[in-house]
């Protein structure tokens, strides 16, 4: 009989979002007429920006001609897209990131998982708690952890708490870690990292020869001009960080699929006594395992940076952040303790009356027909918290707030 990857058996009962779907399905089967409002999974709801749609339509027509047809594209992404990303997202902010250091992909979730392909299993790893579950689960799947304890913490991983007690700041650890996952603006808490905090992290990483995996998928939602959008705004980050970005939330590409990862050419790792270039390893990995993002989609992503695209993206981001403000202001006025929802599209709510995260999930589902995300699904430090997403229509967000406020 064929042998399986037994590391998958270490995973807790189910990935957070499939478990949410299971409970919704069970509830809906018993209550088929319930008008559910979903503020749980962070999927966008508004249409693709017009500039992106028009660019993709033109690309489709181009592909229908003999001269314009394109087959396999470069695994790293088309040069014209990488150049426009470099100029707009990095050089314009004082970051020394070239087009060659940008790898276009079909999702930051995929990249933050696949990056483990080029990193050794002996690395000492730290994650924040609460944490985006993908960071943890992919380390489990690839044999980098032991079993989970009763609260879901895996042996072999170290957890850095970010909570109301420490101002949702990821404190610099005293121990040495080889690999550190940071996500700011943070999913799920909505917290941000100041320039001073990121300077401290880069200093720590350089002193300890550590690698920071920096998830900046929500950088477009930052309102505070003092908050960095990229870790590469910090001097020295080129020597100790990889950054993941996505068009999913700012441009509505969750179903279209386009993202990118930045790996500076100056970034190094160790293989025994040999010093190795991480850029070359990732380039080799992508060339072997990835066929690239479609030409049509990349033309749509390129349009994000056009004059019209920038205006439309700004409007789209503002729409979702207005939703976040509606959530935060209504729940705060009703007596809930609410964090985030200022520089990120997520509100992180303290559950009332010491309810557990899943009990509050079931309570809102049954009493208000509103779906959110239990904080405990993001780690032990998320117990007693609940995440609501701003990704929905204005009508649904306002209706959901009316229902929840009535329950308080």
Swiss-Prot record:
Residues with PTM N6-(pyridoxal phosphate)lysine: 249
Keywords: Aminotransferase, Pyridoxal phosphate, Transferase
Pfam families the record matches: Aminotran_1_2
Cofactor requirements of the protein: pyridoxal 5'-phosphate
Record carries keyword Transcription: no
Superkingdom as given in the UniProt entry: Bacteria
Transcription found in the keyword field: no
E.C. number: 2.6.1.83
Enzyme class: transferase
Reactions the enzyme catalyzes: (2S,6S)-2,6-diaminopimelate + 2-oxoglutarate = (S)-2,3,4,5-tetrahydrodipicolinate + L-glutamate + H2O + H(+)
Binding site residues for pyridoxal 5'-phosphate: 72, 108-109, 132, 187, 218, 246-248, 257, 291
Pathway: Amino-acid biosynthesis; L-lysine biosynthesis via DAP pathway; LL-2,6-diaminopimelate from (S)-tetrahydrodipicolinate (aminotransferase route): step 1/1
Subunit (UniProt): Homodimer.
Function statement: Involved in the synthesis of meso-diaminopimelate (m-DAP or DL-DAP), required for both lysine and peptidoglycan biosynthesis. Catalyzes the direct conversion of tetrahydrodipicolinate to LL-diaminopimelate.
Matching NCBIfam families: DAPAT_plant
Protein name: LL-diaminopimelate aminotransferase
The organism of origin for this protein: Prochlorococcus marinus (strain NATL2A)
Gene name, Swiss-Prot/TrEMBL: dapL
